[in-house]
A protein has these predicted regions:
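Short, histidine-centered active-site or binding-site loop motifs used for metal coordination
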Residues: 17, 58, 104-106
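Short, internal active-site loops enriched in acidic
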Residues: 103-109, 148, 167
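Short, proline-centered helix/strand-breaking motifs
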Residues: 107, 288-291
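DPxDG-like acidic metal-binding loop motif
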Residues: 112-132, 136
Length: 292
């Protein structure tokens, strides 16, 4: 039996960071995001040779293990092992024999939610293979727990829900880990206009968001009012952007991104660097003068 799955990467359009605890647990978070036509891929091939073979092309990891109920988390293929260990444990299953192959259209650290999307993608493949009774909400929640709690990787909640639900979504993150996903019904002409108005620009550098997120958590826990007030405004930007998008107001959409970026830089050191700021300034302030 061979099972294939894919899950879409996402653009965080507004509210980014308000889905991270403890802020979301204290104040509640709001996120507006959209998935794009870049994906994480997973293939599982059931075998009978008593081996677990991992070909993780996204992390350049190629390993083989004897079939077991628990795979040691040692830095190699941690996302795959984390999903496997949790499923075997939660559903009290016997050790499995299989080959798993993963690939991602974007590099890790590109800011598109690659790791969380891969966890959802791997989960979806196991769900199909083992006929597990998990819907999109349950899959998202389980992916979050695997990545944040089991593996101890810092981050928020939006990426897992974006990958599982897909499309344009307005998400609410409430205390007690309650998440509500509100799909936006976008008119086709607005989506076309948005695509024509945006450029997805890769700086050429990948980086881990863990240090930035850890600083955001610290600022909230310590009561840093500058950072907290900035996050309040970032959260409000998700509300404002939802209205702008539904009306097709691209000028207001761009204005909200600019204002939110200024607030984002107040959240933690390392949010920006000279390369990122130069690119942002180029698209924000460069004007084309046509001959008259």
């Amino acid at each position: 039996m061979i099972v294939r799955s894919k899950a879409p990467l996402r653009l965080g359009l507004a509210g980014g960071g308000s889905d991270v605890s403890p802020y979301s647990n204290i104040y509640g978070g709001l996120i507006l995001n959209a998935t794009i036509n870049l994906y994480a891929y997973c293939t599982i091939e059931e075998t009978d040779n008593g081996q677990i073979v991992i070909d993780a092309f996204d992390s350049h990891c190629h390993k083989s293990y004897s079939s077991a109920k628990l795979l040691m988390i040692d830095g190699d293929a941690s996302l795959i092992k984390g999903v496997y260990n949790r499923i075997i444990h939660d559903y009290d299953l016997e050790a499995k024999s299989f080959k798993i192959t993963t690939y991602n259209d974007a590099p890790a650290g590109s800011g598109l939610g690659t790791s969380s999307t891969m966890v959802v993608c791997i989960l979806k493949a196991f769900i199909e293979w083992l006929s597990l009774p998990l819907g999109d909400y349950e899959t998202s929640r389980l992916a979050y727990e695997i990545e944040r709690k089991d593996l101890g990787l810092s981050g928020g909640k939006q990426d897992q829900y974006a990958a599982a639900f897909g499309g344009f979504n307005y998400m609410e993150f409430l205390p007690n880990d309650i998440v509500i996903v509100n799909p936006l019904k976008m008119k086709r002409w607005i989506v076309d206009e948005l695509e024509a108005s945006m450029v997805l620009y890769f700086t050429g550098a990948s980086r881990s968001s863990a240090a930035i997120i850890d600083e955001q958590k610290k600022n909230t826990s310590s009561g840093n009012q500058t950072a907290i007030e900035a996050m309040h405004r970032i959260k409000q930007s998700a509300v404002d952007m939802k209205l702008a998008l539904l009306k097709g107001d691209m000028a207001e959409f761009a204005h909200i991104i600019g204002q939110a970026w200024e607030d984002k830089k107040k959240m933690a050191n390392g949010i920006t660097n000279p390369t990122i700021q130069k690119a942002f300034d180029a698209v924000s302030y460069t004007h084309l003068t046509l001959p008259t």
